[in-house]
UniProtKB/Swiss-Prot annotation:
Keywords: ATP-binding, Chaperone, Metal-binding, Nucleotide-binding, Zinc
Native source species: Synechococcus sp. (strain CC9311)
Domain ClpX-type ZB: 1-51
GO molecular function, one term: unfolded protein binding
GO cellular component terms, A-Z: HslUV protease complex
GO term, biological process aspect, one: proteolysis involved in protein catabolic process
Name of protein: ATP-dependent Clp protease ATP-binding subunit ClpX
UniProt cross-references to Pfam families, sorted A to Z: AAA_2, ClpB_D2-small, zf-C4_ClpX
Binding annotation for ATP: 144-151
Quaternary organization: Component of the ClpX-ClpP complex. Forms a hexameric ring that, in the presence of ATP, binds to fourteen ClpP subunits assembled into a disk-like structure with a central cavity, resembling the structure of eukaryotic proteasomes.
Positions of the UniProt region annotated as Disordered: 50-79
UniProt keyword Flavoprotein, yes or no: no
Family statement drawn from the similarity comment of this UniProt entry: Belongs to the ClpX chaperone family.
Length: 451
């Protein structure tokens, strides 16, 4: 038996019993004292991140599970470093076309939120000298698909240099049912912050498709609505502010799992959705139900007119309208700031193609410049692309699909053709998806136009 024991080795590092001081046996596995010390260091590091201090009697370690060192947390915002509302809106104007009213609402709301964090000072400083408590105001964005709801939230996080996470409300279910727990939203934010709890607690979470968790009727149902009203109930404490237990590996929580604690009282939640049919609810309350038909000129202008009218009606939105739509009053009360985004017209789509810093025209010009090809778009070609995107009724998302279809053959052939150094996208090429006008530079050979 002693001879057999001499061949025992650690199941993790592979060292034999003679190479270590202690070898502990388990059901079919063995672990040495060195691996136990390494595990303790990893656990100490996770507890430091979750609670801000190491375990009692243990010295903090700077090692991570990957063997590297963690970056230090960024300093908390101060009243002097927070950008003013006009500065925030100016930055949004560089990235997002149109939506002036929504950008103004969000600029003020975000400024007040981070001003509140600076005032609190993590429970110290100025806030300790006054009895006034500042409560956070989450934001509800209402607008059709492709109008810029996600981009607005993402641009705000980029400017403020805070972690940003996007969640899909349609994948969430009430605890105990198949689907994602609401705590998994916080895990995504934590991962964006490199598992830095302090940094994650100053981040922004955007919950998309929030209108899809509306309950089926205004009256409470006697049956269980695990993906509708049940999710709204589960989100209440998280939106208001609570200390949530987040499983570090995701998935369902169980009693024997170590969880990371995150305080959500400083996290800004932005919820967005299309809310199709909400304008009808508002019109019914205002007594403006119209009976009749809108003439169609064959180019879909009746649909565009209806979208614009819907956005105008939603400016008179009241909390009771959202209750009739299917959101519970407790959920609406935790989203005190709301902004309505308007549908994008053809002129706005043209601006999106050319004006922002990351405009599609600039992106594809940069891609082809890496192949020493200068790409240009005629003004009429840009108009044709915007017109086609407007016809597809998916907002700005349609633009990339159209340009990708348009550029497929060109980006396949041009990198291999050394004779072409410039290319111009024309209106005819957009309308027919064939041909193009090649503009060779002096000393280059004329490239054949495709049929």
């Amino acid at each position: 038996m002693a001879k057999f024991d001499a061949h025992l080795k650690c199941s993790f590092c592979g060292k034999s019993q003679e190479q270590v001081r202690k070898l502990i046996a388990g059901p079919g596995v063995y672990i040495c004292d060195e691996c136990i010390d390494l595990c303790n260091e990893i656990l100490d590091e996770e507890l430091i991140d979750a609670q801000g201090n190491p375990r009692h009697g243990a010295e903090p370690s700077k090692k991570t599970a990957a063997g590297g060192t963690r970056k230090t947390s960024k300093p908390a915002p101060t009243l002097a470093t927070i950008p003013k509302p006009q500065e925030i809106k100016g930055f949004l104007d560089e990235q997002v076309v149109g939506q002036e009213a929504a950008k103004k609402v969000m600029s003020v709301a975000v400024y007040n939120h981070y001003k509140r964090l600076a005032w609190q000072g993590d429970g110290q400083g100025e806030a300790a000298q006054t009895a006034t408590r500042l409560h956070k105001s989450n934001i509800l964005l209402i607008g059709p698909t492709g109008c810029g709801k996600t981009l607005l939230a993402q641009t705000l996080a980029e400017m403020l240099d805070v972690p940003f996470a996007v969640a899909d409300a349609t994948t969430l279910t009430e605890a105990g049912y198949v689907g994602e727990d609401v705590e998994n939203i916080l895990l995504r934010l934590l991962q964006k912050a490199d598992m830095d709890v302090e940094q994650a607690q100053r981040g922004i979470i955007y919950i998309d498709e929030i209108d899809k968790i509306a309950r089926k009727s205004e009256n409470p149902s006697i049956t269980r609505d695990v993906s509708g009203e049940g999710v709204q109930q589960a989100l209440l404490k998280m939106l208001e502010g609570t200390v949530a237990n987040v499983p570090p590996q995701g998935g369902r929580k169980h009693p024997y799992q170590d969880c990371i604690q995150i305080d959500t009282s400083q996290i800004l939640f932005i919820c967005g959705g299309a809310f199709v049919g909400l304008d009808d609810v508002v019109q019914k309350r205002m007594g403006r139900n119209a009976i009749g038909f809108v003439p169609n000129d064959g180019r879909g202008r009746n649909r565009a007119t209806r979208d614009i009218q819907a956005a105008q009606v939603l400016r008179h939105l009241e909390p009771d309208d959202l209750v009739k739509y299917g959101l519970i009053p407790e959920f609406i009360g935790r989203m005190p700031v709301s902004a309505v985004l308007e549908p994008l017209d053809e002129h706005a789509l043209e601006s999106i193609l050319t004006e922002p810093r990351d405009a599609l025209v600039k992106q594809f010009s940069t891609l082809l410049s890496m192949d020493n090809v200068q790409l240009d778009f005629e003004a009429q070609a840009v108009e044709a692309i915007a017109k086609e995107a407007h016809r597809r009724k998916t907002g700005a998302r349609a633009l990339r699909g159209i340009v990708e279809e348009l550029m497929l053959d060109l980006m396949y052939e041009l990198p291999s053709d050394q004779n072409v150094t410039a290319f111009t996208i024309t209106k005819a090429m957009v309308e027919e998806h064939t041909g193009g006008k090649v503009l060779p530079l002096p000393g280059t050979k004329q490239h054949k136009e495709s049929a």
